[in-house]
Amino acid sequence: MIQSQHSQTARHALAETVVLAKARKNLSFAQLTEGTGLSEAFVTAALLGQHALPADAARVVADKLGLDDDAVLLLQMIPLRGSIDDRVPTDPTIYRFYEMLQVYGTTLKALVHEKFGDGIISAINFRLDVKKVDDPEGGSRAVITLDGKYLPTKPF
């Protein structure tokens, strides 16, 4: 039976356990994703408490991390989503995304509405990808793809 969580406490604790086990075993999120049939971004988000994993994927990941049956069950529960407090993020990486939305949020909104009309881009019917590419000017660049289904506003 599908279960849902009413607080973030258990998933936050599990996320801490996952990160520690991942470090102890020197595994990457890509390695943890192997054999799940899911994307690296989705599995990573699930392990950090933002998605439920299907039973078979939860078992694959738990076996790699040495997690118990309770952890497998928790990984399958629908979480109470949202992990950023109602304040400006202080982690430098997360803050840069916040900054990007501060600078480009209204631009993104204007362009989405101009191209699609009144509506939103789903974060549920959604794909995320992160790639590292060489910068021709030296160093590396992060290519982040946010691919969400457009959902029009429906008058009622």
Swiss-Prot record:
Signal peptide: none annotated. SUPFAM superfamilies: Cyanase C-terminal domain, lambda repressor-like DNA-binding domains. The active site is at R96, E99, S122. It comes from the Bacteria. One of its GO terms (molecular function) is cyanate hydratase activity. Its EC number is 4.2.1.104. Keywords: Lyase. Coiled coil: none annotated. SMART domains: Cyanate_lyase. The keyword Transport does not apply. This is Cyanate hydratase. It comes from Burkholderia cenocepacia (strain HI2424). The gene is cynS.
